[in-house]
Amino acid sequence: MSSLSRELVFLILQFLDEEKFKESVHKLEQESGFFFNIKYFEEKALAGEWDEVEKYLSGFTKVDDNRYSMKIFFEIRKQKYLEALDRNDRAKAVEILAKDLKVFATFNEELYKEITQLLTLENFRENEQLSKYGDTKSARSIMYTELKKLIEANPLFREKLAFPSFKASRLRTLINQSLNWQHQLCKNPRPNPDIKTLFLDHSCSPSNGARALTPVNLPVAAVARPSNFVPLGVHGGPFQSNPAPAPNANALAGWMANPNPSSSVPSGVVAASPFPMQPSQVNELKHPRAPSNSLGLMDYQSADHEQLMKRLRSAQTSNEVTYPAHSHPPASLDDLPRNVVSTIRQGSVVISMDFHPSHHTLLAVGCSSGEVTLWEVGSREKVVTEPFKIWNMAACSVIFQGSIVKEPSISVTRVAWSPDGNLLGVSFTKHLIHVYAYQGSDLRQHLEIDAHVGCVNDLAFAHPNKQMCVVTCGDDKLIKVWDLSGKKLFTFEGHEAPVYSICPHQKENIQFIFSTALDGKIKAWLYDNVGSRVDYDAPGQWCTTMLYSADGSRLFSCGTSKEGDSFLVEWNESEGALKRTYLGFRKKSAGVVQFDTTRNRFLAVGEDNQIKFWNMDNTNLLTVVEAEGGLPNLPRLRFNKDGNLLAVTTADNGFKILANTDGLRTLRAFEARSFEASKASIDMKVSTSAMASSISPAIGKIEHMDAGSPARPTPIPNGIEAMSRTMEKPRNLDSVDKSKPLELTEIVDPTQCRQVTMPDSKDSVSKVARLLYTNSGVGVLALGSNGVQRLWKWIRNEQNPTGKATASVTPQHWQPNSGLLMANDVPENPEGSVPCIALSKNDSYVMSACGGKVSLFNMMTFKVMTTFMPPPPASTFLAFHPQDNNIIAIGMEDSSIHIYNVRVDEVKTKLKGHQKHITGLAFSTALNILVSSGADAQLFFWTADSWEKKKSSAIQLPPGKAPVGDTRVQFHNDQIQLLVSHETQLAIYDASKMECIHKWVPQEALSSPITSASYSCNSQLVYASFADGNIAVFDAESLRLRCRIAPSAYMPQPTPNSAPIFPQVITAHPQEPNQLAVGLSDGSVKVIEPSELSRRWGVGVAAGSDKAGTENGRPSSSSAANNSSSDQIQR
């Protein structure tokens, strides 16, 4: 069919839609096969109208077209089958099995047998793979998410998912233009012609009434159904019958459709698949978004489900797709950060900038002087500055030592945050990279590497094989991959010029790196030693940088040629070809232009003393911003993750911050919080210092209370110290300078925090022994001393739109319809039993024990999937290996540690060294070690592959204290620092050196034994509970006390004869850093959060007041807050 005929079909579709002929619209979409209406397909799929779903699909593909199409039809028919089983319609299920699913038996007979066996089950959820299948609505939603991915990846749907962009009522416009042209040809044109028909050409009637009638003959061929997708020519010979064992080559296969001869990968390599493929289907497999697996029972707890449900709710009011004038809503200039809100002077030329991935107003800046600075752009303050210095000259190469002596000047080339924001990487113009660990407002030296000979041109973080790594490139034409201990994992050779930039990325489960060199070559590498997978020429063939859009779906590059011509392009990944070339650059540039992307919609480039913006879908320049002047010729720029702030360099050695409306709101909110916090702090300090001369420190109280109250106040050391701190410039509490004492906030009243008690949790017989949040953050799981596990879940509703755990809403005590309990085997005398528990990463299974066998429970059905490791000895601690859920470290009652392989039901090795039972286990993937702790107050460090003992260390106990008591261990997010808790102390260890670096001991208001401790989810806080009911919040970097939560704030007043109630265990929410949960000695479980006003621990809120920092809740100084300085151990 000609392109004009095809466009006519689109005009008719638009006309039918505007005239509300909805059924005709979808019928024409199906019959023409030109436009697949994904919204209509979604509506029918979620409504379960399976016949219409398949009928509509049939206009675009058939079951056996390719493996994408096969899996699409399989998922639809499988869902149809499961729904019949779910409503107990066995006859219908058998019919679907025989008529609809039988076709797939020839491709995967084993799967067909497994599906057939579901008929024999009373509830198909008894099948392990279907145990997470929820209700029909949620299952359809998950299915649709999978179908959408398959459709987008299917080459038969290429160019058919987006409706062309043209003006509304275009067909009417063309007809009117035709009529106007016909009217101009009239011999006697009338001023207001009367158009009565379109079947005949228009002609104004002559005066005598005669009319000339001319039939219309449109030069348009009859509409025919398009032919099937014609693949690109298969290169490299016939299809290989033996598929590759791993799908690595498939990720970049599209780029290899016509590779240069230098490509080192055999062209016939494709991903393994259980279905036989014809040679004509090879190129259809060469698409970067292949299905995650072949026909199978999908995960009904998909990560995409939550986002999908949000979108479904927002789309309920308009299910039908419309055909707008543009395929995407026009880009609003208001979405762009164009307004200058601050100008900050750095002092030397700014070379590189990067916003923190979660703290959206924290900007890292690298300079030509080698200096690295963190700026809080909300308050326009420097958080920390690190001048360049060599950390360990002796470890550097002789070449570098000679170079730095000869020419000591050095510049930053790149600063980059790790995806989790815990690490900051810096590369330099001579050999070195530095990696800092970021802690609140502090940068701690973590790793220095002499990485390349000459300049290190770029640095980025990647996560191959679930291991955080640093990727670098340099003038030595090499790309290198390093782990966080400084070990070199890979060296990629193949570029013939200095490597200019790198772009690590992941598509599905394939991880790779794009690299560009100064000769304009683009190469791609997998994390192996095979060599480059791609060899392409970048536009301009000189300095080029590559970036993906925020959602990772679109690839862009920007660069400049040696002649000064600049290029900004979008790539078609599936074909390795240019998709768009953006217009708007001036003729010649005197350097290399820099660019960035944001919101999956906009591109920004610094050129000609301006910032130029493009909409990704339009090659024409969207707008230009001069930022009130003062920009250099080629300014460098960087968006924050939300896209509401933009940093751009200035000509006078500084940078400007530009914001849109959302960005302004973010900055104002930050300023308001900083002002309130500082105002409260200053008010308190002035008042206390005025009283200090006449009041003894021992009786200076924050609030009036009985002497016997558990919330007894902390004395103010002296008025002079308090007054001196009033002169300090206040700053955001989350970025306090650690060299200065933190202020202590006392929370003594229930109005000063939010709390909720889990329903049906109180049990005087069973104490809460272990407590966990689910990894998704929607539930709390408690293991009692009686071996029974209880689960509470928060429901998504208007009061709790996220569905996450919150202290503002009471959760549900969750149990399956069967009424089963998750009860462990318990010995006849359970008093000496040590309960232990571990949860799988996807929240599907929980493993626990309480003096008996270890049981693996299904979290949906509460059924016991298997048991193992019967006593003696009994298990006392459980930990999944972070990289292999089939490997479990099990601490035992006899002081040994068993490394157990679930798959083969075998203990692989036993680790011995402790003298008493094991009380804690923690893995570090960064250091590849396992740390164990025992009731003997000992720590052991083991290698996590050979399981050899590296070192043992006894924790430092107070004089006269016997080495007994549970010792717990937990790794910081950086996988280097280790939190060690014992009833006598909290300690932070540097696990890479196996040395204690900070310690805090109970004292004064917090003098009772410590019962439990945990890092917050971002590892910036440490929560600790005490035997007298107090809860303390510490700054994680230094163990300085930030906040004390008295028992009176979250527990009722005890009666005279009642047993004391206190927290047995404390745990932190996996996504909310200021939310904690405690399990109490009376069996109850509580979730606690700061008040709505303060939002963070350490910001005072008055009891019974709606203002922060007045009287009761205000912060106070405490010697307990500062004792870590005296106990700090030198590194």
Curated annotation (Swiss-Prot):
SUPFAM superfamilies xref list: Quinoprotein alcohol dehydrogenase-like, WD40 repeat-like
Alphabetic keyword roster: Jasmonic acid signaling pathway, Nucleus, Phosphoprotein, Repeat, Repressor, Transcription, Transcription regulation, WD repeat
Start-end of Low complexity biased regions: 1116-1131
Domain LisH stretches: 4-36
Modified sites of kind Phosphothreonine: T214
WD repeat intervals: 345-385, 407-446, 451-493, 495-535, 585-624, 629-668, 763-802, 829-867, 870-910, 913-952, 959-999, 1005-1044
InterPro entries, A to Z: CTLH_C (IPR006595), LisH (IPR006594), Quinoprotein_ADH-like_sf (IPR011047), Topless_fam (IPR027728), Topless_Znf (IPR048419), TPL_SMU1_LisH-like (IPR054532), TPR1-like_2nd (IPR054080), WD40/YVTN_repeat-like_dom_sf (IPR015943)
A single cellular component GO annotation: nucleus
Domain comment as written in the entry: The N-terminal TOPLESS domain (TPD) (1-209) binds directly to a 12-amino acid LxLxL EAR motif peptide.
Subunit (UniProt): Tetramer. Interacts with NINJA/AFPH2. Interacts with SMXL6, SMXL7 and SMXL8. Interacts with SPL (via EAR motif). Interacts with SPEAR3/TIE1.
Protein name (record): Topless-related protein 2
Organism: Arabidopsis thaliana
